[in-house]
Amino acid sequence: MSLKDFIFTSESVGEGHPDKVCDQISDAILDAYLEQDPKSRVACETLATTNLVVIAGEITSKGKVDAQEIARNVIRDIGYNDITMGFDADFAVVSAHVHAQSPDISQGVTEGEGLFKEQGAGDQGLMFGFAINETPEFMPMPIYYSHELVKHLAGLRHSNKLKFLRPDAKSQVTVEYKDGKPVRVDTVVISTQHSPDVAHKQIEESLIEECIKKVIPANLLVNTKYFINPTGQFIVGGPHGDAGLTGRKIIVDTYGGYGRHGGGAFSGKDPSKVDRSAAYMGRYIAKNVVASGLADKCEVQLAYAIGVAEPVSVHVDTFGTGKISEEELVKRIRANFKLTPRGIIESLKLLEKGRKYRETASYGHFGRKGSTFTWEKTDKTVALKG
């Protein structure tokens, strides 16, 4: 096979996956603080295991938030409301252990308090944004359909159409590429938690007909292999089956491994943390580059020093698909996008009243629709064309 002929796989996880339970709790707590005080500094981490949730982190805010009650509401919304699952919204022990943000960090991210006048980055680090024109959402096909499968699966569960479904689930999609373009789905894997009183054959048939074939177009399902609950059963799941932690699904949250990742997680962090906000800006830039037709594929790297506003570097890679040089593209990006923490927050309205970061905490942060996902706008295409 040439470099343009290959097979690529990405995975996603459902809202009831233990790590995603933690992401949603952390982001729901973040939302509650920002709703009361947009200047809140939040770094909220969650751990979940058998009927136990531990919330920890650094939070400085004028807001007063009942983190335990928020956690229970999230767990209940997801569907963990039966003690026999080993994790129940009403019976779980929920403890919170938070303290104020370090003053050494605070002075660097608060305008006028650090060595530099402007609001600086909340930490050093590198962040990537990516876009590709192989789906209408400008996302790689493997991660796009992986997300859609677990999202549809959750809908089947919440609507009670498939009564045997329980909250924990994972998906994996393998796509075959010819000449760099996706031509078929080679393999689909779905593992879903279920009640004890259902036969494996029923699960397999139901998921192929009611989930896979409803999500993935028939023209892509050519000689496709299906692996449905391939261990034979999946009764013990959620935080009772595996302990969960915030920030442990960073590849699921982004591009499924198709684009690079700087290593920083998103959930539970307010927008002063460039791990989150600069990754959103990177996606915004890359998507506008591809949507403008200046490249078929684009990856943007932004890098920051703690306490410093301007990025220390901006790098672009169009993988040989660019219509203009990458040097020229960097110039146009710097001219048309605000890359300081404050500029990113203002451009993407990351502190806008009513924003719900919890919406980002399952089914990926990118390729999504809705008012929360402001980094998905393609309103810079004309400016980028010059």
Swiss-Prot record:
Annotated catalysed reactions: L-methionine + ATP + H2O = S-adenosyl-L-methionine + phosphate + diphosphate
Transferase keyword on record: yes
A single MF term (Gene Ontology): ATP binding
Positions of the UniProt region annotated as Flexible loop: 101-111
UniProt keyword terms in alphabetical order: ATP-binding, Cytoplasm, Magnesium, Metal-binding, Nucleotide-binding, One-carbon metabolism, Potassium, Transferase
Pathway the protein takes part in: Amino-acid biosynthesis; S-adenosyl-L-methionine biosynthesis; S-adenosyl-L-methionine from L-methionine: step 1/1
Binding positions for ATP per the UniProt entry: 17, 168-170, 242, 248-249, 265, 269
Localization terms from the record: Cytoplasm
CDD domains listed in its UniProt record: S-AdoMet_synt (cd18079)
EC identifiers of the protein: 2.5.1.6
Sequence positions that bind Mg(2+): 19
Cofactor binding note: Binds 2 divalent ions per subunit. Binds 1 potassium ion per subunit.
Residues given in the record as L-methionine binding sites: 58, 101, 242, 273
GO CC annotations, alphabetized: cytoplasm
GO biological processes: one-carbon metabolic process; S-adenosylmethionine biosynthetic process
Coiled-coil blocks: none
Cofactors: Mg(2+); K(+)
Chain positions recorded as K(+) binding sites: 45
PANTHER family: S-ADENOSYLMETHIONINE SYNTHETASE (PTHR11964)
Family, as annotated: Belongs to the AdoMet synthase family.
Purpose of the protein: Catalyzes the formation of S-adenosylmethionine (AdoMet) from methionine and ATP. The overall synthetic reaction is composed of two sequential steps, AdoMet formation and the subsequent tripolyphosphate hydrolysis which occurs prior to release of AdoMet from the enzyme.
Record-linked HAMAP family: S_AdoMet_synth1 (MF_00086)
Binding partners and assembly: Homotetramer; dimer of dimers.
Protein name stated in the entry: S-adenosylmethionine synthase
Organism the protein comes from: Leptospira borgpetersenii serovar Hardjo-bovis (strain JB197)
